Amino acid sequence: TLGMPLGATKLYLHGLTADQQFRTEYLTRLTSSPRLADMTYVDLPPYYPATWFWFGGRYADLLGLPGWEAYKPWAIVSIAAAAALGAALWNRMVGPLIGTGVGLAVTVATLRYAAPEPYAAVLILVGVPMLVVIAAALRGHGRLADGPAPLQRTGWLSVIAAGVFLGVSATVYTLYTALFAGTAILVTLVYLVQIWVQIRNKAVRDDEIAALRRAR
């Protein structure tokens, strides 16, 4: 999908116009040295999160490419790797048949709307399935209809995975990290409302609810 329009050029989508100019500049800066630095001003810390560009710089240095020339292949490689990881997560959560279809749909939509911003595309491809993991981390083990589970049924693997993802995301793109964290807050509010409704529901006695929870 990306290879066809880029086959005749060493530059990435949109060349060196608009925001691609500073992205190419940033990658070139971190190719010349692994030390974190601003894309334009010498001896200043980076203004933007640097993870994607830092690894891109190591990729360029490993292959002996100038930063501007490595930008295109690094964008394609990183997006492809993120798409594969996202598909693997979907397959793990909903099975290969549905997971492959969902992963393909997310990949196509991401390439359609976010490909010019490759580090954003990487986060979207991994972040969409990770939102399911974040929801599971907040809910714990059990059915969605049952609401959040007690503390002893917390899915700690999901909690750790969600925390690691949000932490890494913050080093890649602050805006999308805020989106993912905001979504987690909204999911938490939904669960809190669900708990409140369950507590206020007098149709089932409290001792029966407690006994039902102990049985799980």
Give the label of every model feature segment.
Residues 63, 67, 71, 149-157, ...:
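Juxtamembrane/transmembrane-helix boundary motifs in multi-pass membrane proteins
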Residues 1, 76-192:
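Membrane-embedded helix bundles of polyisoprenyl
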Residues 54, 162-164, 211, 215:
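Short hydrophobic "helix-edge" motifs at membrane interfaces and signal-peptide entry regions
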Residues 2-124:
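Active-site lumenal/periplasmic loops and adjacent helix-entry segments of GT-C-fold
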Residues 60, 134, 175, 215-216:
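Generic low-polarity alpha-helical segments
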Residues 30-31, 138, 193-196:
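Hydrophobic residues in alpha-helical segments
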Residues 180-216:
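Perimembrane helix-loop-helix junctions
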